[in-house]
């Protein structure tokens, strides 16, 4: 790309802001327009359910870069900008105010949004979702000493919010329709461990139950009515039942994006002038025989931002990175690396009953993924095993006399 060309980035989250910075780092001298639909400059979302909600961080500390950096690097950051349409033939985007902006390359980094559920009472005051700073501010004002909060959904966000609520002196009850928390995203040992850790700190759990409706009085939530007619009283409720990718813009323009915009190893879509990065994508996984997968994590957003910038600038493709994810709950640090595609063996190292432990997901002796709790060495070693496609025996992994770092070489 040359100095006469323009890159438009739709979405000013972690992925969008990072690709803008990467382009400047690679000496792209053309126009960069970063369009964000929030009134805030790009910020970190993961702390919203943890440190920010708990009052340990403020909005300023969440910013990815100081506001003045965008101007100094010649990045035009446009806030509160909604992109209404994409014209691939004309190579321009149309904003909600009818403004049309042309591009030479377009990056779609529209992220994801909370999944909607149709429940009577869902629009009552005191029923929250958690996706933006404004969402977190609204929830923060509703929790505190003596307040009881119901979490509809037992995924990572639900557990993180429950931990923050208890940390602020409130009480929390997690309502999950599956028979365990983190079903589908964590192993049974990790799921059971985190549930016990929460219960030890006073969090209640109702699993294997359905929510019939949200009840209220004078327009404000008062409880969650279950399918078996039990009532779970609460002062506030948080609906956290997963996310869906914001593919509407791409799909309307004819790109493949049923469950995520399909991209290649360079984060390029079927249109050679359009890239997509972050939560909105479905991408090949080079460490897993290019299996297509929808990854929704900050490390994935950063990796794809680097891929897209390199491709636009004609630079070599960055080396594949091991996908990973983290969660903080109370004083526990959960770290996960890899994806357990087709894993048929789970090997525990350490004892969950004693505290720190790790769980290795394997197939035919190959380490595909690792889950750890307060086990940074095992996490780091596990990442290397995944990267190197290490083949190990169960005996090697479970033997505490064998240094885990020695297994990663």
Curated annotation (Swiss-Prot):
Family affiliation: Belongs to the FAD-dependent oxidoreductase family.
UniProt pathway: Terpene metabolism; monoterpene degradation
InterPro entries linked: FAD-oxidoreductase/Apoptosis, FAD/NAD-bd_sf, FAD/NAD-binding_dom, FAD/NAD-linked_Rdtase_dimer_sf, Reductase_C
Role, per record: Involved in the degradation of the cyclic monoterpene limonene. Probably part of an electron transfer system involved in the oxidation of limonene to perillyl alcohol.
Organism: Castellaniella defragrans (strain DSM 12143 / CCUG 39792 / 65Phen) (Alcaligenes defragrans)
Record EC number: 1.-.-.-
Pfam family, any one: Reductase_C
Keyword rRNA-binding: no
MF (Gene Ontology): oxidoreductase activity, acting on NAD(P)H
GO cellular component, as recorded: cytoplasm
Disulfide bonds: none
Keywords: FAD, Flavoprotein, Oxidoreductase
Binding residues for FAD: 15, 37, 50, 83, 279, 298
Reported cofactor(s): FAD
Top-level division of the source organism's lineage: Bacteria
Induction: By the monoterpene alpha-phellandrene, but not by acetate.
Protein name stated in the entry: Probable ferredoxin reductase CtmF
């Amino acid at each position: 790309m040359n100095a006469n060309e323009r890159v438009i980035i739709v979405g000013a989250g972690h992925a969008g802001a990072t690709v803008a910075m990467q382009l400047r780092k690679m000496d792209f001298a053309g126009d960069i327009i970063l369009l964000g639909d929030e009134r805030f400059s790009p910020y970190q979302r993961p702390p919203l359910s943890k440190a920010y909600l708990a009052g340990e961080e403020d909005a300023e500390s969440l910013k990815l870069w100081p506001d003045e950096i965008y101007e100094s690097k010649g990045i035009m950051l446009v806030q509160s900008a909604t992109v209404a349409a994409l014209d691939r033939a004309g190579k321009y985007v149309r904003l909600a105010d009818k403004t049309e902006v042309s591009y030479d390359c377009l990056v779609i980094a529209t992220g994801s949004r909370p999944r909607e559920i149709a429940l009577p009472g869902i629009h009552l005051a005191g029923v929250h979702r958690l996706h933006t700073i404004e969402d977190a501010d609204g929830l923060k004002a509703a929790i505190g000493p003596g307040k009881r909060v119901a979490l509809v959904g037992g995924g990572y966000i639900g557990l993180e919010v429950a931990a923050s609520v208890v940390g602020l002196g409130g009480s929390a009850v997690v309502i999950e329709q599956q028979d365990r928390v983190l079903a589908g995203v964590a192993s049974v040992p990790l799921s059971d461990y985190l549930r016990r850790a929460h219960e030890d700190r006073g969090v209640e759990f109702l699993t294997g139950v359905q929510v019939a409706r949200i009840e209220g009085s004078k327009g404000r939530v008062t409880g969650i009515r279950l399918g078996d007619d039990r009532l779970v009283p609460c002062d506030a409720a948080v609906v956290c039942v997963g996310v869906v990718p914001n593919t509407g813009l791409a799909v309307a323009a004819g790109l493949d994006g049923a469950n995520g915009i399909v991209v290649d190893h360079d984060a390029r879509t079927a249109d050679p002038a359009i890239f997509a990065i972050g939560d909105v994508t479905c991408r090949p996984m080079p460490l897993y025989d290019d299996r297509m997968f929808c990854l929704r994590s900050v490390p994935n957003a950063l990796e794809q931002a680097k891929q897209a910038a390199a491709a636009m600038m004609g630079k070599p493709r960055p080396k594949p990175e091991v996908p990973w994810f983290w969660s903080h709950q109370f004083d526990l640090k959960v770290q996960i690396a890899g994806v357990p595609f087709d894993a048929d063996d789970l090997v525990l190292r350490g004892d969950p009953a004693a505290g720190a432990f790790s769980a290795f997901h394997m197939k035919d002796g190959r380490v595909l993924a690792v889950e750890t709790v307060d086990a940074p060495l095992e996490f780091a070693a596990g990442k290397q095993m995944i990267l190197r496609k290490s083949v190990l025996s169960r005996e090697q992994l479970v033997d505490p006399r064998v240094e885990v770092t020695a297994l990663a070489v």
